[in-house]
Amino acid sequence: MAQTLQEFTHALEEKHLPRVLHIQSGIYYQGCVYEVFGQECSLSTGDLLKVTEITISRFNALTSSSTEIQLPVEYPGLFKLMADSQPYRSIQEIADSLKIGPQRVAQPVFLSAVDVDLEPGLVLRRRDSFRITAVEWSCGRVHCELLHREPPICFSLSFCQQGPFSECQDHQCYTLKEIADWKIPRGRKRSVVEVKAPAKKNFLFSGLLENVCGELLLTPVYELKAISRLSEKVLLIPSNLDVEVVDVTEQYDCDSFVQPLSLMDVYKRPPQFFPVLAKLSSENHFRLSPDLESLFQSKEVIIHHPFKAKRILASEMCQESARHFLIPESYNGRFKRRPRQFSTAYDLERARSETEEIRVVATKDFETVYSGLASVQAGEEFIVTKGQSCAVSHNGTEKVADTFECVKVKAEGKEPVRLPMCLEGGFMELVKDKRQYTIAEICRWFPLPFNVKVSVRDLSLKADILAGTPSLHIEEEISDPCVLVSNTDLSDFREVPVNRTDLIFNVKQRWDGESPKFSVKSAIEEISEDCYYTIRRYAIATITPPPRPPKKPKDPPPRPPKTSRSESTNSESSSCSPKTLHVEPFKQDGLLQCCDSRNGNEQKIPISPVTLPRPSLQKARAKGRSLDDISMDKHAASDNDVHDYEYIDEEQLDNIRRTYQEQQINTKAKPSHTI
């Protein structure tokens, strides 16, 4: 049965790709194929096409004043998603509508509107929120994790489980590309608010939403990637093209079509697939770095093998917009240390190293009210000892320490002191080390993040872009998917990053030569701000959050005497005031044990305190069959623990991290720049 191309696109699910289409009623100019801006705007009647992928090419954004604006997916602003007001009827509808994967960005969170019986003794209560972490299509189930529980409670739900299930509010910020890839359900629209506009210097995009306020309703516009039976190139066909098609997949062999492969498709191939001789698609519209342009001037290349390259993510330290770099381990330049700044004592504890002591000077005053904990005055010098992690022993059991031990430097000598982890002061590192380090030595010997300056440029590079930076903030090591590609005479080898290079190959045949055994020189890559935030977001999602800070102690320290009237007033106000963070008083009879944090022993790190609205404790019922009861019963024995923890939502942890790592993002919308 014939249908329009737009009807076919809306009804098609990605799991049913590829599909073969027969053009019933075509439209064309001056020939079979006529291209405008890389898209096919005409097809001939009788053409056969194999549709391999459906992607979003742009969004039609409707403003609150009913003005429609076209936004390309490359728009560099950041957006906050509004929760979908339309609930999902069943788990089957969720699995069919959303892309669910191992990345945190691909794991949606829902709220159950009904009680769901999971198994004997377990009930998913109404208003409980859960995250879907994976889909098992063969069994017809989704794997879930109940939120606001510790330890996490995992369970599974069948596709036939009826809801309704409502989407929870997502406090993360996304680019339009991420929204297009992960956050647009099939057949639905999305409401968003822009939280960061493009830089003024970006003349192409900065004016698109300049005078727009309020929410934007995004309607996706799809395009189809297809292959013609008579051509090797990939066709980009807009879904609103006025043609009629018939799905004839059952009548034709999909393998009879030429099979172009993207760089990600090549990377996912098994090891026995390599090495291969491939031809670069001449119809592909891509942008290459200068280092790769010379390699791909010849249309045929040899793809040797895929691998994961180790890269070091670093940012330029400057007042204005900082540049970001991916530095290979093979970089031969030398670095000198630059002083680090620590905003809390917890950051000092995390920077503790086995290789050296850390000398810091306090930049803020801190007056303690707890016995056994030292006060801090601006200008005082401290030494953080190396390779030790502090833990308090209570009745033979190690518990998370709320303090750590360091040394205060005085004129008459050194004095061991203890500082609370939640000390919101400030410390500046004193650097006396004049040695020059390689990038590999820094990552091996010092905990990241770390501050350096290039002292000797890499002489093997024609232009060392790091040498001109005032100083660098080395943030973390990442694994970057790459493929090793060379020209046919093996005179030029390059590591091609998969996630940041848009290439289409037509694999011709297997190559019978031997791949090189030597290491390939890698280039420094400067990445965009959007790419940087994407890398940081996915890296942060894999980091296990530290333990939570302690609650207010049960036995607070003595306070100065007050009048009876003020005591009565303070007593009434404290009974209804919100709980605040306090450090447990140090007990003189407690035994401090220092365990080596590098010998494989389990290390627990308390969280750096940040002022946040704290949710109330969830009370356990006397008896019941819900997941709430099971979770509380498991930890009933630890109710007397001095660390009476409260739950901090993961979205709040993301906000904490963004506060420190994305300080340039203004999370409050402003009419002049945001919507």
From Swiss-Prot:
Region span, CABIT 1: 1-252
GO cellular component: cytoplasm; nucleus
Composition-biased stretches (Low complexity): 566-577
Superkingdom of this protein's organism: Eukaryota
Protein localization: Cytoplasm; Nucleus
InterPro entries, sorted: CABIT_dom, THEMIS
GO annotation, biological process: adaptive immune response; negative T cell selection; positive T cell selection; T cell receptor signaling pathway
Disordered as annotated region, ranges: 543-582, 594-643
A Pfam cross-reference name: CABIT
Region described as CABIT 2: spans on this chain: 253-510
Biased composition (Basic and acidic residues): 625-643
Protein's UniProt keywords contain Nucleus: yes
The entry's keywords: Adaptive immunity, Cytoplasm, Developmental protein, Immunity, Nucleus
Keyword Cell cycle: no
Function description: Plays a central role in late thymocyte development by controlling both positive and negative T-cell selection. Required to sustain and/or integrate signals required for proper lineage commitment and maturation of T-cells. Regulates T-cell development through T-cell antigen receptor (TCR) signaling and in particular through the regulation of calcium influx and phosphorylation of Erk.
Family: Belongs to the themis family.
PANTHER family, A to Z: CABIT DOMAIN-CONTAINING PROTEIN, PROTEIN THEMIS
Name recorded for this polypeptide: Protein THEMIS
Originating organism: Danio rerio
